[in-house]
Protein backbone atom coordinates (compact mmCIF):
# COMPACT_ATOMS: atom_id res chain seq x y z
CA UNK A 1 0.00 0.00 0.00
CA UNK A 2 1.69 3.18 -1.18
CA UNK A 3 -0.17 5.37 1.31
CA UNK A 4 0.79 3.40 4.42
CA UNK A 5 3.76 1.39 3.09
CA UNK A 6 2.07 -1.68 4.57
CA UNK A 7 2.87 -4.96 2.87
CA UNK A 8 -0.71 -6.10 2.30
CA UNK A 9 0.09 -9.40 0.57
CA UNK A 10 3.07 -11.56 -0.16
CA UNK A 11 3.95 -15.08 -1.23
CA UNK A 12 7.10 -17.04 -1.99
CA UNK A 13 7.03 -19.49 -4.90
CA UNK A 14 9.59 -21.44 -6.88
CA UNK A 15 8.48 -19.78 -10.12
CA UNK A 16 6.74 -16.63 -11.34
CA UNK A 17 3.51 -16.75 -13.30
CA UNK A 18 0.41 -14.69 -13.90
CA UNK A 19 -1.88 -17.24 -12.26
CA UNK A 20 -0.02 -17.03 -8.94
CA UNK A 21 0.03 -13.23 -9.14
CA UNK A 22 -3.72 -13.16 -9.82
CA UNK A 23 -4.45 -15.42 -6.83
CA UNK A 24 -2.29 -13.22 -4.59
CA UNK A 25 -4.16 -10.09 -5.65
CA UNK A 26 -7.54 -11.75 -5.10
CA UNK A 27 -6.53 -12.83 -1.60
CA UNK A 28 -5.19 -9.34 -0.82
CA UNK A 29 -8.44 -7.68 -1.90
CA UNK A 30 -10.42 -10.12 0.25
CA UNK A 31 -8.11 -9.88 3.28
CA UNK A 32 -8.08 -6.07 3.21
CA UNK A 33 -11.85 -5.84 2.73
CA UNK A 34 -11.45 -3.80 -0.42
CA UNK A 35 -14.76 -3.21 -2.14
CA UNK A 36 -15.67 -1.34 -5.27
CA UNK A 37 -16.17 1.80 -3.17
CA UNK A 38 -12.40 1.96 -2.48
CA UNK A 39 -11.52 3.90 -5.59
CA UNK A 40 -9.34 4.73 -7.32
CA UNK A 41 -7.46 1.50 -6.78
CA UNK A 42 -4.26 1.03 -8.76
CA UNK A 43 -1.78 -1.83 -8.79
CA UNK A 44 1.64 -0.55 -9.80
CA UNK A 45 4.13 -3.21 -10.85
CA UNK A 46 7.26 -3.81 -12.85
CA UNK A 47 7.15 -4.98 -16.45
CA UNK A 48 7.75 -8.65 -15.73
CA UNK A 49 5.75 -11.28 -17.58
CA UNK A 50 3.56 -12.24 -14.57
CA UNK A 51 2.51 -8.63 -14.02
CA UNK A 52 1.59 -8.19 -17.71
CA UNK A 53 -0.07 -11.59 -18.13
CA UNK A 54 -3.58 -11.82 -19.52
CA UNK A 55 -4.63 -13.78 -16.42
CA UNK A 56 -3.57 -11.04 -14.02
CA UNK A 57 -4.91 -8.22 -16.19
CA UNK A 58 -8.32 -9.93 -16.41
CA UNK A 59 -8.34 -10.48 -12.64
CA UNK A 60 -7.58 -6.80 -12.10
CA UNK A 61 -10.37 -5.84 -14.51
CA UNK A 62 -12.85 -8.04 -12.65
CA UNK A 63 -11.79 -6.51 -9.32
CA UNK A 64 -12.00 -2.96 -10.66
CA UNK A 65 -8.27 -2.38 -10.19
CA UNK A 66 -6.39 -0.26 -12.71
CA UNK A 67 -3.02 -1.72 -13.76
CA UNK A 68 0.02 0.56 -13.82
CA UNK A 69 3.52 -0.39 -14.90
CA UNK A 70 6.94 1.14 -14.50
CA UNK A 71 8.19 3.08 -17.48
CA UNK A 72 11.06 1.43 -19.33
CA UNK A 73 14.48 2.62 -18.12
CA UNK A 74 13.01 4.83 -15.37
CA UNK A 75 14.77 3.54 -12.28
CA UNK A 76 12.67 5.30 -9.64
CA UNK A 77 9.22 4.38 -10.96
CA UNK A 78 8.91 1.70 -8.30
CA UNK A 79 11.01 3.41 -5.63
CA UNK A 80 8.69 2.53 -2.73
CA UNK A 81 8.86 -1.19 -3.45
CA UNK A 82 12.60 -1.04 -4.08
CA UNK A 83 13.01 0.67 -0.71
CA UNK A 84 11.06 -2.11 1.01
CA UNK A 85 13.25 -4.73 -0.72
CA UNK A 86 16.36 -2.90 0.46
CA UNK A 87 15.03 -2.86 4.02
CA UNK A 88 14.42 -6.60 3.71
CA UNK A 89 17.86 -7.43 2.36
CA UNK A 90 19.66 -5.28 4.91
CA UNK A 91 18.07 -6.96 7.92
CA UNK A 92 20.85 -8.52 10.04
CA UNK A 93 19.19 -11.94 9.92
CA UNK A 94 18.88 -11.96 6.10
CA UNK A 95 20.82 -15.04 4.93
CA UNK A 96 23.90 -14.02 2.95
CA UNK A 97 24.02 -17.38 1.19
CA UNK A 98 20.32 -17.67 0.38
CA UNK A 99 17.61 -19.79 1.93
CA UNK A 100 18.01 -23.53 2.45
CA UNK A 101 14.48 -24.37 1.30
CA UNK A 102 11.41 -22.59 0.03
CA UNK A 103 9.70 -23.27 3.37
CA UNK A 104 12.57 -21.58 5.22
CA UNK A 105 12.23 -18.62 2.84
CA UNK A 106 8.48 -18.41 3.50
CA UNK A 107 9.00 -18.47 7.28
CA UNK A 108 11.66 -15.77 7.05
CA UNK A 109 9.50 -13.53 4.86
CA UNK A 110 6.51 -14.01 7.19
CA UNK A 111 8.62 -12.82 10.15
CA UNK A 112 9.99 -9.91 8.11
CA UNK A 113 6.51 -8.76 7.03
CA UNK A 114 5.26 -8.93 10.63
CA UNK A 115 8.22 -6.85 11.81
CA UNK A 116 8.02 -4.39 8.89
CA UNK A 117 4.29 -3.76 9.24
CA UNK A 118 3.99 -3.64 13.03
CA UNK A 119 7.38 -2.72 14.53
CA UNK A 120 9.41 -0.86 11.90
CA UNK A 121 9.10 2.86 12.49
CA UNK A 122 9.32 4.06 8.93
CA UNK A 123 11.33 7.23 8.30
CA UNK A 124 9.13 8.10 5.31
CA UNK A 125 6.11 7.98 7.63
CA UNK A 126 7.70 10.20 10.30
CA UNK A 127 8.47 7.16 12.41
CA UNK A 128 5.11 5.47 12.70
CA UNK A 129 4.70 1.87 11.59
CA UNK A 130 3.00 1.02 8.30
CA UNK A 131 0.23 -0.68 10.32
CA UNK A 132 -0.37 2.48 12.37
CA UNK A 133 -0.65 4.53 9.19
CA UNK A 134 -2.85 1.90 7.53
CA UNK A 135 -5.26 1.85 10.50
CA UNK A 136 -5.36 5.67 10.59
CA UNK A 137 -3.71 5.74 14.03
CA UNK A 138 -0.96 8.11 12.84
CA UNK A 139 -2.87 11.41 13.26
CA UNK A 140 -3.41 10.79 17.00
CA UNK A 141 0.24 9.76 17.40
CA UNK A 142 1.36 12.93 15.63
CA UNK A 143 -0.88 15.11 17.82
CA UNK A 144 0.67 13.55 20.94
CA UNK A 145 4.16 14.16 19.57
CA UNK A 146 3.37 17.82 18.95
CA UNK A 147 2.25 18.18 22.57
CA UNK A 148 5.42 16.50 23.87
CA UNK A 149 7.65 18.68 21.72
CA UNK A 150 5.79 21.87 22.69
CA UNK A 151 6.13 20.97 26.38
CA UNK A 152 9.85 20.29 25.96
CA UNK A 153 10.30 23.60 24.17
CA UNK A 154 8.40 25.45 26.89
CA UNK A 155 10.63 23.89 29.58
CA UNK A 156 13.91 24.61 27.77
CA UNK A 157 13.32 27.37 25.17
CA UNK A 158 17.05 28.10 24.75
CA UNK A 159 17.59 24.60 23.37
CA UNK A 160 15.25 25.37 20.47
CA UNK A 161 16.58 27.72 17.79
CA UNK A 162 13.54 27.14 15.58
CA UNK A 163 10.03 25.79 15.93
CA UNK A 164 9.29 22.18 16.73
CA UNK A 165 9.61 19.42 14.18
CA UNK A 166 6.86 19.17 11.58
CA UNK A 167 4.92 16.04 12.50
CA UNK A 168 2.29 16.34 9.76
CA UNK A 169 1.81 13.55 7.25
CA UNK A 170 0.48 14.08 3.74
CA UNK A 171 -3.16 13.18 3.24
CA UNK A 172 -2.44 11.68 -0.19
CA UNK A 173 0.58 9.98 -1.70
CA UNK A 174 1.43 9.70 -5.38
CA UNK A 175 3.91 7.47 -7.12
CA UNK A 176 4.62 10.08 -9.81
CA UNK A 177 2.88 13.31 -8.82
CA UNK A 178 1.98 15.72 -11.56
CA UNK A 179 4.33 18.66 -11.57
CA UNK A 180 2.53 21.99 -11.40
CA UNK A 181 3.60 24.44 -14.03
CA UNK A 182 5.52 27.45 -12.82
CA UNK A 183 3.77 30.83 -13.30
CA UNK A 184 6.34 31.67 -16.00
CA UNK A 185 5.47 28.53 -17.97
CA UNK A 186 1.75 29.07 -17.52
CA UNK A 187 2.07 32.61 -18.89
CA UNK A 188 4.19 31.42 -21.81
CA UNK A 189 1.53 28.93 -22.83
What residues fall within each predicted segment?
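Charged DNA-binding/catalytic regions of mobile-element recombinases
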Residues: 1-189
